[in-house]
């Protein structure tokens, strides 16, 4: 009887304990929720003085106003910056997250020069499934250590080794374009993009994927689809939760694309690492290093051998993060810059003639590949590229997560705010670029750029987290453009308003870049 009574008491104690635990968990959840709401309310109140767009609602902010279509969304943001150009900054709420848009050189400088405000926006977390915590997405000590390790791999003497690859792929591109000479206008955007993809694959991984010959490869499709899905998800707060995202068809497609991308990169890394180990074994037993004697060096080879201050090498996962980052950042941005350059040159024949004359001066009638010395002499072409990136920056906006409260133009910007720098608007400030919509490469002549605010032009970002690969990008852009322009005369077939600007992760023309080609004949010019 006593045993039965004790059993009943024990059962009641268990039930009471479970109920108490549930009550405690529920109370903790409610308390946590109340704390979040209170924190949100404080932020809302404290940031009230910052100029803002009308019709922001609690919790959802301006999210309901945001256009879902990439083209309409970008146009909406640019219209806001034009409307509020007289204001030093502009506040937007994306769900419960406050954002301040910066398009004024003095205020952009505050964020980009700070050694404390180096954390990338929380929105970059949507890149992490693909890129991990590589140079683009990492923060704090990991970023500092990784940046220090990788900076030597972008030294110009190393970049020179990649010029042969750039020349070879540019010549393949020219052969592909030959069929369009004296034909109807065609969309050149994808041609250029595939060329840039071939270049970054071979320079980053030592792998020639032949994208220009096989544009339907599984890897190529996955690269483009992944970029589209990431941008779409960033704009839609209701897709931010991973478990919820996987309930949609796009979430499963994201997972499948991710598997394709990582499988490819992992296999290339393993293959390259095995080759390096085999060569080391050969050297160890006196057989030399013949297997890799004629193999071109790639960024991957440098990553496999680079060490930190303590002599530690990167892990396989670390290397994959950086290779995937090179792939993501290294082809779309460059391809966009080249496409926009072709559009602007085709729309401004007087500028194209000046480039023509410079090419004649440097190359004459020779069809030899460009050398490093040739590229250094193409100063006017470099000004064309700079002016192109002013009008159409490859990355039209990027963000930092404010890691501690700061002051911008007299306004208090709170920790946790997303500071969004908008180069597309920044580069159109008439104080620094009179007649900002006009294409004038001469703006970047040294005498004309003198005295311009150093943060009025940031196509590669600026400060501690500037683009580590900008020299590589400019080298590739000059190589491909000079190769195209030595063979063809470009005519654009679109007006500016017909381009349909789409500011995804990269600034693209939603309607493509349509041009006509004529064979260039130096004797007639």
Curated annotation (Swiss-Prot):
Q: Pathway listed for it? A: Lipid metabolism; fatty acid metabolism
Q: Where in the cell is it found?
A: Endoplasmic reticulum membrane
Q: Which domain of life is it from?
A: Eukaryota
Q: Which UniProt keywords apply?
A: Corneal dystrophy, Disease variant, Endoplasmic reticulum, Heme, Iron, Lipid metabolism, Membrane, Metal-binding, Monooxygenase, NADP, Oxidoreductase, Sensory transduction, Transmembrane, Transmembrane helix, Vision
Query: Found in which tissues?
Result: Broadly expressed. Detected in heart, brain, placenta, lung, liver, skeletal muscle, kidney, pancreas, retina, retinal pigment epithelium (RPE) and lymphocytes.
GO cellular component terms attached to this protein's record = endoplasmic reticulum membrane
One of the entry's Gene Ontology molecular-function terms is: oxidoreductase activity, acting on paired donors, with incorporation or reduction of molecular oxygen, NAD(P)H as one donor, and incorporation of one atom of oxygen
Q: Which CDD domains match?
A: CYP4V
Tell me which Gene Ontology terms the entry assigns under biological process. fatty acid omega-oxidation; retinoid metabolic process; sterol metabolic process; visual perception
Effect in UniProt of substituting residue 331 to P = In BCD; impaired omega hydroxylase activity
> What is its membrane topology?
Single-pass membrane protein
* Keyword set includes tRNA processing: no
Q: Which InterPro entries match?
A: Cyt_P450, Cyt_P450_CS, Cyt_P450_E_grp-I, Cyt_P450_sf, Cytochrome_P450_Monoox
Q: Which residues are noted in the entry as heme-binding?
A: 329, 467
Which PROSITE patterns does the protein's record reference? Answer: CYTOCHROME_P450 (PS00086)
| Principal subcellular localization | endoplasmic reticulum
Q: Which family does it belong to?
A: Belongs to the cytochrome P450 family.
Q: Which disease is it linked to?
A: Bietti crystalline corneoretinal dystrophy: An autosomal recessive ocular disease characterized by retinal degeneration and marginal corneal dystrophy. Typical features include multiple glistening intraretinal crystals scattered over the fundus, a characteristic degeneration of the retina, and sclerosis of the choroidal vessels, ultimately resulting in progressive night blindness and constriction of the visual field. Most patients have similar crystals at the corneoscleral limbus. Patients develop decreased vision, nyctalopia, and paracentral scotomata between the 2nd and 4th decade of life.
PANTHER family, per database record: CYTOCHROME P450 4V2, CYTOCHROME P450 FAMILY 4
- The identity of this protein, by name, is Cytochrome P450 4V2
Give the originating organism.
Homo sapiens
């Amino acid at each position: 009887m006593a045993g039965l009574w004790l059993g009943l008491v024990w059962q009641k104690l268990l039930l009471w304990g479970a109920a108490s635990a549930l009550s405690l968990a529920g109370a903790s959840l409610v308390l946590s929720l109340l704390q979040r709401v209170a924190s949100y309310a404080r932020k809302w109140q404290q940031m009230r003085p910052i100029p803002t767009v009308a019709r922001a609602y609690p919790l959802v902010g301006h999210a309901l106003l945001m256009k879902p279509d990439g083209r309409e969304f970008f146009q909406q943001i640019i219209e806001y910056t034009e409307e509020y150009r007289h204001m030093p900054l502009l506040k937007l709420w994306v769900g419960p997250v406050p954002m301040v848009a910066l398009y004024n050189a003095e205020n952009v400088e505050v964020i980009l020069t700070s050694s404390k405000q180096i954390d990338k926006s929380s929105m970059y977390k949507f890149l992490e499934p693909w890129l991990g915590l590589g140079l683009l997405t990492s923060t704090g000590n990991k970023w500092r250590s990784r940046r220090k390790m990788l900076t030597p791999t972008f030294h110009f003497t190393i970049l020179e080794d990649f010029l042969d690859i750039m020349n070879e792929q540019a010549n393949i591109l020219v052969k592909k374009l030959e069929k369009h000479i004296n034909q109807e206008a065609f969309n050149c955007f994808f041609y250029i993009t595939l060329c840039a993809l071939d270049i970054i694959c071979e320079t980053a991984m030592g792998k020639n994927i032949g994208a220009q010959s096989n544009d339907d490869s599984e890897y190529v499709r996955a690269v483009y689809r992944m970029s589209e899905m990431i941008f779409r998800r960033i704009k839609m707060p209701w897709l931010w939760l991973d478990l919820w995202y996987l309930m949609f068809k796009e979430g499963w497609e994201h997972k499948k694309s991710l598997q394709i991308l990582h499988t490819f990169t992992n296999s290339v890394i393993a293959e390259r690492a095995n080759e390096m180990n085999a060569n080391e074994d050969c050297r160890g037993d006196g057989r030399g290093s013949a297997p890799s004697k004629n193999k071109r060096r790639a960024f991957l080879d440098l990553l496999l051998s680079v060490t930190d201050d303590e002599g530690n090498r990167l892990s396989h996962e670390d290397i994959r993060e950086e290779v995937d980052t090179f792939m993501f950042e290294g082809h779309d941005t460059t391809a966009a810059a080249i496409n926009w350059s072709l559009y602007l040159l085709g729309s401004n024949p007087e500028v194209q003639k000046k480039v023509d004359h410079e090419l004649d001066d440097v190359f004459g009638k020779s069809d030899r590949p460009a050398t490093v010395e040739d590229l250094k002499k193409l100063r006017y072409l470099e000004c064309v590229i700079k002016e192109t990136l002013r009008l159409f920056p490859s990355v039209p906006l990027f963000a930092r997560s404010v890691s501690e409260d700061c002051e911008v133009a007299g306004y208090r910007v709170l920790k946790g705010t997303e500071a969004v720098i908008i180069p597309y608007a920044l580069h159109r400030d008439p104080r620094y670029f009179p007649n900002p919509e006009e294409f004038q490469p001469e703006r970047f002549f040294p005498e004309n750029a003198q005295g311009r605010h150093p943060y009025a032009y940031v196509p590669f970002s600026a400060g501690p987290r500037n683009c580590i690969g900008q020299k590589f990008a400019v080298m590739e852009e000059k190589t491909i453009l000079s190769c195209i322009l030595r063979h063809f005369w470009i005519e654009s077939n679109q007006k500016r308003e017909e381009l349909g600007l789409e500011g995804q992760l990269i600034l693209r023309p939603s309607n493509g870049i349509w041009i006509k080609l004529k064979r260039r004949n130096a004797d007639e010019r």
